[in-house]
Amino acid sequence: MIFLLLLLWLIPVVVAVISRRYARPSLWRNTGIAFGLVVSPATLGLYALYFLGPIAALLGIVALPLHLLHGSPGYELAVRFGLVPSHTVVEGFMHLPIEAINGVIWSIVYGLVGWGIDAFGKSKHHGQSTTA
């Protein structure tokens, strides 16, 4: 299961490669949306490396605050919507509504950041003269 969560990191990389080739003007927006969709479960997988050994534990230590940051909005909203009971340990399929909400939230956030980078890049290149 840890391996599958770690494979999620490949999704934004693949989207970036495809966007670089076919949709260059929206490269960062597409990559940001893909990153936002997978960042919460992927950081959980990265945190699970903490238990595999001393070298992998370094990645796990870095991943813990990242998962706490990216996991809490989905959990709070899932509790408020009644999808997950409060004051219980979240395990198994109880992660699904939490991670779905996190995917929506963080894909919007990182998609907007990527859109801003794309817009800045367009304005930067738009101001340059193309005459030699």
State where each predicted segment sits.
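N-terminal signal-anchor/start-transfer transmembrane helix
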Residues: 4-23
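Alpha-helical transmembrane segments of polytopic membrane proteins
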Residues: 1-8, 58-68, 94-104
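Juxtamembrane non-transmembrane "cap" segments at the membrane-aqueous interface
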Residues: 51-81
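Aromatic-anchored segments of alpha-helical transmembrane domains
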Residues: 38-47
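Membrane-interface helix-boundary motifs at transmembrane edges
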Residues: 19-33
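Periodic glycine anchor positions in long extracellular repeat architectures
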Residues: 31-36, 114
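Individual transmembrane alpha-helix segments
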Residues: 81-109
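Cytoplasmic juxtamembrane regions at transmembrane-helix boundaries
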Residues: 104-132
